[in-house]
């Protein structure tokens, strides 16, 4: 993806208009385009805190993995969504790590953790945007917990 295409992607976000020209260039200089085939591990115990993922196309599964190997899906991300928990080490209120897998072939942009941290410190609008997205994803998590604890198995299957 060329610089102009990246620019078009980011101009749609509300924080963009509040960034300095220097920070905009810094973001565009540090963004990396990645492709993962279906089934690939994007973030795992071996590769933690990648940075922020901007999903251009595909489906990502964000989940917890217990020491015993049990998995609990937190939520799924789809085209044009943003994965903030892939940069959990940069978010002071997040104290756990997640696993992220590509459920379908995925094209995404990665803003690595260190440049992401610098930009968040420089721009309160970006920081607010990221925390807002994170809380929106936690609403999905709470909805899943409610289904698990408060619906019968039959109700959950019917809703699926």
Show the residue positions of the predicted features.
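Cyclic nucleotide-binding regulatory module and flanking cytosolic helices
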Residues: 1-37, 82, 87-90
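Short loop/turn microsegments at loop-to-beta-strand junctions
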Residues: 31, 49-50
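Well-ordered beta-strand positions
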Residues: 35, 53-54, 76, 101
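Glycine- and acidic-residue-biased ligand/ion/polar-headgroup-sensing regions
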Residues: 39, 50-63, 78-80
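Short phosphate-coordinating micro-motif centered on Lys-Gly-acidic
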Residues: 42-47
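Short alpha-helix-to-loop micro-motif enriched in aromatics/charged/Gly
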Residues: 67-74
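Cyclic-nucleotide recognition modules
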Residues: 74-132
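Polybasic "coupling" helices that flank or enter modular domains
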Residues: 121-160
